[in-house]
């Protein structure tokens, strides 16, 4: 039996309003629990359009047929008008998710984090995280125990900022297995559970055809020698490609693959986790930098 952490990122108003209820129904039918990470502030995702001047981002949008994939309401959100606040307008949906699944913070403003957080000082990072956590906790009526930054835009400064919140774990980077990030003080910080597998939009049209993606992904999962973690998006697998996701779940079950919340991948004690740090890096299929797991030698 292969156990895979299932992380569901919710980036937009439409993803929350339409994608999450559909995913909740499907996961319930298949008796699967997952980790949902919600963006709760303004939906300004349309402001990413300026990135079309960057060849890598333009190519990604073209090969994924972004207009059909996301819809024009997402692609234009927050451009000609103020972005709608996601969390409070969809509080009932988020509370419904919290009844059966692990809930964490993705972002206050997904676009702002992905675009600007790499240049923020630590206090700005702390304030932004605190704002998102406060809103999400008000919605679900209980403390939030985990988070996953937007776009995997994280480095050691983000790691340090998140220590203020005493979360159970974070999922801020790409890597191979859970680890303890080493802090400036020399101590180890809140465990990180990296995403190990490519997302749909990173490989479709570049490495694999849409129709072949599920088989390709299942093969990657079965060959994974670390701790497999897979990310889906409410805007993709909860909307335009929902039936493909249903097919993935059915095929995974036949292969002996089970999905679980990310917290179930943590060992009984943190001491069992290796030390590491988050450094800025790049991966194929994704424009710009993102946080990547890097091992830390015990001799350091």
UniProtKB/Swiss-Prot annotation:
CDD domains: CE4_ArnD (cd10939). Pathway: Glycolipid biosynthesis; 4-amino-4-deoxy-alpha-L-arabinose undecaprenyl phosphate biosynthesis; 4-amino-4-deoxy-alpha-L-arabinose undecaprenyl phosphate from UDP-4-deoxy-4-formamido-beta-L-arabinose and undecaprenyl phosphate: step 2/2; Bacterial outer membrane biogenesis; lipopolysaccharide biosynthesis. It catalyses: 4-deoxy-4-formamido-alpha-L-arabinopyranosyl di-trans,octa-cis-undecaprenyl phosphate + H2O = 4-amino-4-deoxy-alpha-L-arabinopyranosyl di-trans,octa-cis-undecaprenyl phosphate + formate. The keyword Hydrolase applies. GO terms for biological process: 4-amino-4-deoxy-alpha-L-arabinopyranosyl undecaprenyl phosphate biosynthetic process; lipid A biosynthetic process; lipopolysaccharide biosynthetic process; response to antibiotic. Belongs to the polysaccharide deacetylase family. ArnD deformylase subfamily. This is Probable 4-deoxy-4-formamido-L-arabinose-phosphoundecaprenol deformylase ArnD. It comes from Escherichia fergusonii (strain ATCC 35469 / DSM 13698 / CCUG 18766 / IAM 14443 / JCM 21226 / LMG 7866 / NBRC 102419 / NCTC 12128 / CDC 0568-73). The lineage of its organism: Bacteria, Pseudomonadati, Pseudomonadota, Gammaproteobacteria, Enterobacterales. The gene is arnD.
């Amino acid at each position: 039996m292969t156990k895979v952490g299932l992380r569901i990122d919710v980036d937009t108003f439409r993803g929350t309003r339409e994608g999450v209820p559909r995913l909740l129904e499907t996961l319930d039918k298949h008796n699967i629990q997952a980790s949902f990470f919600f963006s709760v502030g303004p939906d300004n995702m349309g402001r990413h359009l300026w990135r079309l001047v960057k060849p890598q981002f333009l190519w990604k949008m073209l090969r994924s047929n972004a207009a059909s994939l996301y819809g024009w309401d997402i692609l234009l959100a927050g451009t000609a008008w103020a972005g709608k606040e996601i969390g409070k307008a969809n509080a009932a949906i988020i509370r419904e998710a919290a009844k059966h699944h692990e809930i964490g913070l993705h972002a206050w403003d997904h676009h702002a984090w992905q675009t600007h957080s790499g240049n923020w000082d630590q206090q700005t990072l702390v304030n932004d995280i605190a704002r998102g956590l406060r809103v999400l906790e008000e919605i679900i009526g209980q403390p939030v125990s985990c988070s996953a930054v937007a776009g995997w835009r994280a480095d050691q400064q983000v790691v340090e900022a998140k220590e203020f919140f005493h979360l159970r774990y974070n999922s801020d980077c790409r890597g191979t297995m859970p680890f303890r990030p080493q802090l400036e003080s020399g101590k180890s910080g809140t465990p990180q559970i990296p995403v190990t597998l490519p997302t749909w939009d990173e490989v479709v049209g570049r490495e694999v055809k849409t129709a072949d993606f599920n088989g390709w992904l299942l093969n990657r999962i079965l060959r994974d020698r670390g701790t497999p973690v897979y990310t889906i998006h409410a805007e993709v697998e909860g909307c335009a490609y929902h039936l493909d996701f249903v097919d993935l779940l059915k095929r995974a079950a036949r292969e002996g693959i089970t999905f679980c919340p990310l917290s179930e991948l943590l060992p009984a004690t943190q001491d069992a986790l290796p030390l590491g740090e988050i450094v800025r890096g790049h991966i194929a299929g994704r424009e710009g930098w993102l946080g990547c797991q890097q091992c830390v030698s015990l001799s350091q």
